Amino acid sequence: MFSIQQPLLVFSDLDGTLLDSHSYDWQPAAPWLSRLHEANIPVILCSSKTSAEMLYLQKMLGLQGLPLIAENGAVIQLAEQWQDIDGFPRIISGISHGEICQVLNTLREKEHFKFTTFDDVDDATIAEWTGLSRSQAALTQLHEASVTLIWRDSDEHMAQFIARLNELGLQFMQGARFWHVLDASAGKDQAANWIIATYQQLSGRRPTTLGLGDGPNDAPLLEVMDYAVIVKGLNREGVHLHDEDPARVWRTQREGPEGWREGLDHFFSAR
């Protein structure tokens, strides 16, 4: 489909895609990460995680210095060499984490919606929920422009909750395991398009794009990619795109980093 020599950007979700949902292992993807690094092809991480959490993972994966998309697109961490861009080192879209917390606390107190946010608990509790170490769990609480929560109410009340958030200029987004509240103007698609445009401006040529994801909140990202890999995941809703042309979209048989590797194998061999 394309070669390792052509201008290319790879956008990848983390949990359930590049990382195993349970063990956080990424070794099955390691050979491809090395090949892409050697070919100077950026792998841009894109997740609901905080930028602090993602910078830690980015270094672990050998991707430090590259841009990344945090908090479902509400935060863009700029590449190290983009220091001349306004907002360096991070661009934040929409209202802040603190402002969203105020809205949620008001809705919970006055309209009695039932949910638990990451701000309601300590890092030990988050470590139990996620399987992370306490030090890593602490990084998940460093939100800048979103709130992560567990919904503990009915589907009917969720519909009402979403309607109220929309009225207030917010959106409710489902991840692989948790729900996320962020500004309605933010999104993985907008963030990815901004990064693509920046690379195009710097190089004078629009790069081909490949995106990989496994959850409903990855759909906006995959919609704006030239090619997309839908990694088999745990979420019952799955991922559904408007354009699922087999020439553009590949659904993997394997989960997590093995599915990630399968997707790369497919698009680099289908020529």
Swiss-Prot record:
Protein name as it appears in the record: Mannosyl-3-phosphoglycerate phosphatase
Annotated SUPFAM superfamilies: HAD-like
UniProt-listed NCBIfam families: HAD-SF-IIB, HAD-SF-IIB-MPGP, MPGP_rel, PRK03669.1
Cofactor or coenzyme needed: Mg(2+)
Family: Belongs to the HAD-like hydrolase superfamily. MPGP family.
Localization: Cytoplasm
Protein encoded by which gene: yedP
Catalytic residue list: D13
Organism of provenance: Escherichia coli O6:K15:H31 (strain 536 / UPEC)
